[in-house]
């Protein structure tokens, strides 16, 4: 299936698990905000028509970008939860996005997305009536903990996967899934969970293990290490990440650069 898709990036969260005054999506790696790499990676795919970023109502860190890779970059006010922010993004999509069009949702603090993974997700997901998510098979041994901190047992890891992003679903089905979950008081932790509650079965598309979410200082250090390797030409997947240069903000335009304050960045 061909055609363009829009992407939604929920970025209204405060990143409390990371700590600090600055939300994690705005923390800098190699001099640029994490979210700059995230948005640049999404917009680099030829099938992505534009991106809606859901930000906090009092967000003073948003750089004011209006385009990335010459594609429109819109904002809307997000909600108190991830699900509320994604729903706000779905409702803020341009009028030309139809109810049955596929839409991508990607974590703001997941900056290491490879173009090849996104390409595979779009190819497989748009060929399915429901959609698909990037995911990685669980490879570690899983232990079930007791209340006292002891091991109560070992869980079989066969057929278990870690959900990654982006996730790809039809706009109207995701709106329905998120709305019904909210009405039922269910806190869905990803978009696939909302779709599953409708009785639908998205596909799993294997993605790279290094498409990780930055949630701790160690994760940030790991991403900076990836960037340093890329600069030295030592990253094995550099060809797949050609749209994510170290100076990620060079592909942005808008009100100001988070790094330089310039009109074009």
UniProtKB/Swiss-Prot annotation:
GO molecular function, one term: 2-C-methyl-D-erythritol 4-phosphate cytidylyltransferase activity
BP term (GO), one: isopentenyl diphosphate biosynthetic process, methylerythritol 4-phosphate pathway
Marked site: Positions MEP for the nucleophilic attack: 157, 213
EC number per UniProt: 2.7.7.60
Gene: ispD
InterPro entries reported for this sequence: IspD (IPR001228), IspD/TarI (IPR034683), IspD/TarI_cytidylyltransf_bact (IPR050088), ISPD_synthase_CS (IPR018294), Nucleotide-diphossugar_trans (IPR029044)
Compositional bias (Basic and acidic residues): 231-241
General function of this protein: Catalyzes the formation of 4-diphosphocytidyl-2-C-methyl-D-erythritol from CTP and 2-C-methyl-D-erythritol 4-phosphate (MEP).
HAMAP family associated with the record: IspD
Protein's UniProt name: 2-C-methyl-D-erythritol 4-phosphate cytidylyltransferase
Biased composition (Low complexity): 253-265
Site for Transition state stabilizer, residues: 17, 24
Keyword RNA-binding among record annotations: no
Enzyme class of the recorded protein, top EC level: transferase
Pathway the protein takes part in: Isoprenoid biosynthesis; isopentenyl diphosphate biosynthesis via DXP pathway; isopentenyl diphosphate from 1-deoxy-D-xylulose 5-phosphate: step 2/6
Pfam families: IspD
The keyword Nuclease belongs to this UniProt entry's keyword annotation: no
Keywords: Isoprene biosynthesis, Nucleotidyltransferase, Transferase
Entries under SUPFAM superfamilies matching the protein: Nucleotide-diphospho-sugar transferases
Recorded catalytic activity of this chain's protein: 2-C-methyl-D-erythritol 4-phosphate + CTP + H(+) = 4-CDP-2-C-methyl-D-erythritol + diphosphate
């Amino acid at each position: 299936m061909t055609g363009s898709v829009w992407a939604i990036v929920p970025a209204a969260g405060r990143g409390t698990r990371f700590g600090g005054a600055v939300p994690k999506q705005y923390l800098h790696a190699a001099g640029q905000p994490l979210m700059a790499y995230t948005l640049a990676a999404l917009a680099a795919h030829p099938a992505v028509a534009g991106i809606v970023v859901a930000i906090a109502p009092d967000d003073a860190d948003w750089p004011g970008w209006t385009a990335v890779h010459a594609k429109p970059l819109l904002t809307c006010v997000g909600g108190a939860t991830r699900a509320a922010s994604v729903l706000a993004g779905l409702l803020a999509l341009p009028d030309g996005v139809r109810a049955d069009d596929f839409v991508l949702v990607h974590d703001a603090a997941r900056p290491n997305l490879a173009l090849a993974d996104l390409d595979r997700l779009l190819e497989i997901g748009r060929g399915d009536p429901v959609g698909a998510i990037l995911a990685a098979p669980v490879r570690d041994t899983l232990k079930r903990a007791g209340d006292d901190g002891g091991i109560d047992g070992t869980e079989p890891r066969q057929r278990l996967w870690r959900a990654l992003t982006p996730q790809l679903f039809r706009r109207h089905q995701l709106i329905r899934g998120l709305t019904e979950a909210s009405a039922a008081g269910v806190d869905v932790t990803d978009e696939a969970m909302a779709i599953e509650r409708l009785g639908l079965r998205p596909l799993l598309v294997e993605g790279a293990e290094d498409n990780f979410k930055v949630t701790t200082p160690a994760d940030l250090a790991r991403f900076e290490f990836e960037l340093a390797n890329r600069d030295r030409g030592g990253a094995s997947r550099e060809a797949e990440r050609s749209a994510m240069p170290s100076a990620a903000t060079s592909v942005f335009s808008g009100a100001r650069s988070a790094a330089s304050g310039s009109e074009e960045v």
